Design a protein with these regions (language model features):
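Hydrophobic h-region of N-terminal signal peptides that target proteins for export
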Residues: 9-17
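Cyclophilin-like peptidyl-prolyl cis-trans isomerases
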Residues: 16-213
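A periodicity- and composition-biased signal for non-globular, repetitive helical segments
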Residues: 8-9, 96
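Bacterial N-terminal signal peptides that target proteins for export
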Residues: 1-5
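Intrinsically disordered, low-complexity segments enriched in polar/charged small residues
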Residues: 7-8, 202
Length: 213
């Protein structure tokens, strides 16, 4: 099942109502808020800058250098099992040579203590150490993507790197996920997962903390 999930989720990537947002990890840690302004609406995310400093820091570099501006959500993978809607949306630079930065060291969930729960932001990658400017947002719990130290498969020992969670705008994520895909777009097992009309990320910006009185 894990291998099937890998083929479905990799790039190369308790039930909640549609209006509920993803729950952040219970323990307090430093987070940086970012809003992704898309043509479908705004998605606000909390980046785990303390728990996943390398991965969250990489995402913030793309934000601060305007590298996501004008990029798109281009993939909507729809899974027909589990709570619905299920799957992910994926966006980012698509390896645009004018936007993409070098790959970053991998931060497994066994180190960060994070998990692929509903609303998780996770880096797309071919193998550990290759993640750069493409990321996924999960519509349901997908903890099978977390690192599994007992696995004999090196891919699953490392898992995928979670670095943040949606805190507002999950309905926008679901709306993007529900948009039509093109049956002729994509290659291999990803054929049919590419969106017929990608959704533009107009801009990505940090949200500054509200000033206290």
């Amino acid at each position: 099942m894990k291998r099937l999930l890998a083929a479905a989720l990799a790039l190369l990537a308790p039930p909640l109502s549609a209006q509920e947002e993803a729950a952040l990890p219970p323990a307090e840690s430093a987070r940086t808020m970012v809003v992704l302004q898309t043509t479908a609406g705004d998605i606000t995310v909390a980046l785990e800058t303390e728990r996943a400093p390398i991965t969250a820091g990489n995402f913030l570099r793309y934000v601060d250098e305007d590298r996501f501006d004008g990029m798109v959500f281009y993939r909507a993978m729809k899974l027909d099992w589990g709570d619905q809607p299920n799957g992910l949306i994926q966006g980012g630079t698509q390896w645009d040579p004018d936007r993409v930065l070098p790959g970053i060291p991998h931060e497994p969930t066994t180190v960060t203590g994070l998990s692929h729960t509903k609303g998780a932001l996770s880096m797309a990658m071919g193998e550990p150490g290759t993640a750069n400017g493409d990321f996924s947002i999960f519509l349901q719990d997908s903890t099978g993507m977390d690192a599994d130290p007992k696995s004999e498969d090196p891919v699953w020992r490392n898992g995928y790197a979670v670095f943040g969670y949606v805190t507002d705008g999950m309905e926008v994520v679901q709306a993007i996920h529900a948009m039509p895909t093109d049956p002729d777009k994509g290659e291999g097992w990803m054929k049919g997962q590419m969106m017929a009309q990608p959704v533009k990320i107009v801009e990505a910006r940090r949200l500054e903390p509200a000033a206290s009185d």
